[in-house]
Amino acid sequence: MFPSAHSRFIYFHKENSNPNYHAYDDTRFQVIMMSGLPGSGKDTWIKENLPEYKVISLDELRQEMGIEPGGNQGEIANAAKSLAKEYMRAGESFVWNATNLNKQLRGMLIRLFAAYQAEIRIVYLETSWLELLRRNKTRTEKVPEKVLYRMKNRLEVPTVVEAHRVDFIVN
């Protein structure tokens, strides 16, 4: 129906857009936004599929900054956004590695990335609940099971209208 992925993206992200309008693709670089519960395989997928990309990992920033998971997450988010802006100003592609569990949070980031002319790709990973719990037990930074359960209940699977491209990977 849409002339291009960029035209579809523009249609769903700008008011009063026409689905037949062939939008000029002014994207300059790519941002890959990971999405999925802890233990779904995001880090492994990045290493196997995008080893050459720079990665902004909120988990790694949390560790580097010495902030506990229950601590001030705003500082981590601000540091991550600052790094992302640096990459985007330079026109460098990168991976935004976080859980990105709900549409509202993804939307805020997508608007930021689009403002810098990014082509946005969401990679959503999913695995069975039992496998998720098994992987969590072997993690260095384990997530309490009740927290995982809460996250699972808040999860909103991305839709194809959120980005230029959305990949669904079930493993």
Name each region found by the language model.
Residues 30-32, 92-96, 120:
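Generic beta-sheet signal
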Residues 57, 124, 168-170:
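Structural signal for conserved beta-strand scaffold positions within catalytic alpha/beta enzyme cores
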Residues 43-94, 101, 129, 133:
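Conserved substrate/cofactor phosphate-moiety recognition/catalytic segment
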Residues 2, 7-9, 14-23, 28-35, ...:
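Conserved GTP-binding G-domain of TRAFAC-class P-loop NTPases and closely related GTPase folds
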Residues 83, 109-111:
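Aromatic/hydrophobic pocket-lining residues that form π-stacking "cages" and hydrophobic walls in ligand
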